[in-house]
Amino acid sequence: MRQVTVTEHLLLHQTKSPAATGQFTALLYDLILAAKIISKSVNKAGLLDVLGGTGQVNVQGEHVQKLDEYANRVLIHRMERTGVLCAMASEENADLIRVPERFEAGDYILIFDPLDGSSNIDVNINVGTIFSILKRKPGASGSKDVTLGDVLQSGVEQVAAGYFLYGPSTMLVYSSGQGVHGFTLDPSVGEFLLSHPDIRYPEQGRIYSVNESYWHYWDEPTREVVSYFKGPDNPLGKPYSLRYVGSLVADFHRNLFYGGIFMYPMDYRLPEKPQGKLRLMCEASPLAFLAEQAGGRATDGTKRILDIVPGELHQRVPLFIGSAGDVDAVEAIYRRHS
């Protein structure tokens, strides 16, 4: 069987996708190179001094893992040199990351979570890099004077989104608006090869993923949502299977293939985070883009995730994402309580 690389796949789809320009291809190429470097360190994490925390706390109020910090450095170092970016934003950085004056600037904006699920790395559970690609608004092309207003765009304006999953094999799953495609890294040739073309969600899932230990911090509609999947009064006529790793990208990836729903609702556990834990721009929005391209849906309970215009760089949102029928059921329950 003829193997198709990511670059070949992009070139084949350039006529269909306005995103697949030469600049976009160059951007994705450098992003893939950064992911290969990160993957190599993740695979050797138990042999290198990269396990555990740094002792620092990031802008999210979370303890920084050594691999978090390393992945963040790799991505910034590689991507600021591409010549096609005007700015970046990372889960680990409080402010916009601007392209230094010594490098050329382009019109693309890269937003990323450098190592999602990194708290699990010490016990060898899958982690990943989530990314979102935007284009700056017209009228400022070629300028490095990027404002927050250029970056705070709704998810529907994304040019592309995806993630790298570091596990038994390293995968790239991405979409530029022409479906969702999966590529697996062949370490013998150092290339991501097309392994899962045109990924589609099953219309109705069999899995629900949520941290049920927060039950006592949820409101009544949220408890009803979870009870719906735990009980027999659903299209399956029996309880869904609970599968929850605690690594967003790993849980999303499994449910994308098997069907089901991932939920991280708002809770009252932490008063400073009333909207839940997940970040709109570097987690919820890129995964929502993938979900919709794969025939699924993503909502905060009442609103489509891709329609939410962020008011700040690190805005948090509740997230219900997965098979369309399952997300429809969630919204129906919240509507009854509104």
Swiss-Prot record:
GO terms for cellular component: cytosol. Disulfide bonds: none annotated. InterPro entries: FBPase_C_dom, FBPase_class-1, FBPase_N, FBPtase. Pfam families: FBPase, FBPase_C. Binds 2 magnesium ions per subunit. GO terms for molecular function: fructose 1,6-bisphosphate 1-phosphatase activity; magnesium ion binding. It is found in: Cytoplasm. Substrate binds at D116, G117, S118, S119, N211, Y244, K277. Pathway: Carbohydrate biosynthesis; gluconeogenesis. GO terms for biological process: fructose 1,6-bisphosphate metabolic process; fructose 6-phosphate metabolic process; fructose metabolic process; gluconeogenesis; sucrose biosynthetic process. CDD domains: FBPase. Mg(2+) 2 binds at D113, D116, E283. Mg(2+) 1 binds at E91, D113, L115. Keywords: Carbohydrate metabolism, Cytoplasm, Hydrolase, Magnesium, Metal-binding. Transmembrane segments: none annotated. Its EC number is 3.1.3.11. Its main location: cytoplasm. Its cofactor is Mg(2+). It catalyses: beta-D-fructose 1,6-bisphosphate + H2O = beta-D-fructose 6-phosphate + phosphate. Homotetramer. Belongs to the FBPase class 1 family. HAMAP family: FBPase_class1. This is Fructose-1,6-bisphosphatase class 1. It comes from Oleidesulfovibrio alaskensis (strain ATCC BAA-1058 / DSM 17464 / G20).
